[in-house]
């Protein structure tokens, strides 16, 4: 049996930069020394990207039932779903490519559930195209949760300088505030503790953001949300032996976290967490969905329609996402 994990790489929306960042990342020989990378997508889109990038590589088309551990550097193995037309336009929202991105992910989840791959690494999809293709989800995370019957999950962003986990994600700010409950905050603190502990960090230090400016400043700002929604969750986590502090003003907490005072920050809503991490490390940032029964990592950027097909995309986030998937994946 192989000790190297099989990593399923979904191609994302092929009208974007997904095929290009996959081709560029798989030029790294070390990936093949550490794992068996398998692309799930359309081979013809990868061939087109390789031509744009002037990369000399061959392709090995597979079905889901074929042997997946015979990968080799210089030959990209692809489970070819053959959904897209050869003349798919770059940089345009397309229901066809949106549907294809969903099907790639659905196939990856099926393979993971069957034990044929040990982790999933996703290239970006376009949310508008996804929904125009008939799949009414905000993004990858929610698809993964539904198709794996997972109720409690969270998005974790990881960069070399900072890790952030979110209480709420793809909802409007007013709805996010309504969704923040002590039970949810407590669960996310637990997920942060478990995820970092499992990755080898002993007694990880967790910092929790407030909701209001200055974390409410003892009721001066807001309507007591910190006292009602966050403090009870932190108190419960402390009783469980979790090393957690807060609620703290978000600006102060992120400064202290990037300085090394905390191993991870619990953000209350999407932009509270995404803004700082993208300022500090967009190129090498990674999105990790925690709480799922399968390992999933992703790039921390979108489809970049404005540069798709031009051969200039930076692949560092995809490469780091692959490294994280390999590190987190169980071996066979």
From Swiss-Prot:
Substrate binds at residues 140-141, 278, 287, 296. Gene3D superfamilies: Isopropylmalate Dehydrogenase. A divalent metal cation binds at residues 170, 214, 270. The keyword Acetylation does not apply. Keywords: Carbohydrate metabolism, Metal-binding, NAD, Oxidoreductase. GO terms for molecular function: metal ion binding; NAD binding; oxidoreductase activity. It is an enzyme of class 1 (oxidoreductase). It comes from the Bacteria. Its EC number is 1.1.1.408. InterPro entries: PdxA_fam. Binds 1 divalent metal cation per subunit. Its cofactor is a divalent metal cation. The keyword Metal-binding applies. This is Putative D-threonate 4-phosphate dehydrogenase. It comes from Oceanobacillus iheyensis (strain DSM 14371 / CIP 107618 / JCM 11309 / KCTC 3954 / HTE831).
């Amino acid at each position: 049996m192989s000790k190297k994990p099989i990593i399923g790489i979904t191609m994302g929306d092929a009208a974007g930069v997904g095929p290009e960042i996959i081709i560029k990342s798989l030029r790294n020989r070390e990936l093949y020394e550490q794992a068996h990378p398998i692309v799930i997508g359309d081979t013809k889109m990868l061939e087109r990207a390789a031509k744009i990038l002037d990369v000399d590589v061959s392709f090995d088309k597979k079905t889901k039932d074929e042997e997946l551990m015979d990968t080799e550097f210089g030959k990209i193995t692809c489970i070819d779903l053959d959904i897209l037309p050869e003349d798919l336009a770059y940089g345009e929202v397309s229901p066809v490519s949106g549907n294809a991105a969903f099907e790639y992910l659905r196939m990856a989840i099926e393979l993971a559930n069957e034990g044929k791959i040990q982790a999933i690494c996703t290239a970006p999809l376009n949310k508008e195209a996804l929904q125009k293709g008939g799949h009414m989800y905000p993004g990858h995370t929610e698809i993964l949760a539904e198709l794996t019957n997972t109720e409690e999950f969270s998005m974790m962003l990881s960069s070399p300088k900072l890790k952030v986990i979110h209480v709420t994600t793809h909802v409007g700010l007013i709805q996010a505030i309504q969704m923040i409950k002590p039970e949810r905050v407590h669960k996310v603190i637990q997920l942060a503790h478990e995820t970092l502990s499992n990755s080898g960090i002993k007694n990880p230090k967790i910092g929790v953001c407030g909701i209001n400016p200055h974390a409410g400043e003892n009721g001066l700002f807001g309507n007591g949300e910190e006292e009602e929604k966050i403090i009870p969750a932190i108190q419960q986590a402390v009783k469980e032996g979790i090393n957690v502090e807060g609620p703290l003003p978000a600006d102060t907490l992120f400064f202290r976290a990037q300085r090394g005072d905390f191993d991870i920050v619990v953000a209350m809503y999407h932009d509270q967490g995404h803004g700082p991490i993208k300022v500090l490390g967009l190129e090498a940032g990674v999105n990790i969905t925690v709480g799922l029964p399968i390992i999933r990592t992703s790039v921390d950027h979108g489809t970049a329609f404005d540069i798709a097909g031009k051969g200039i995309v930076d692949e560092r986030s995809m490469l780091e996402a692959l490294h994280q998937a390999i590190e987190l994946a169980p071996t066979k």
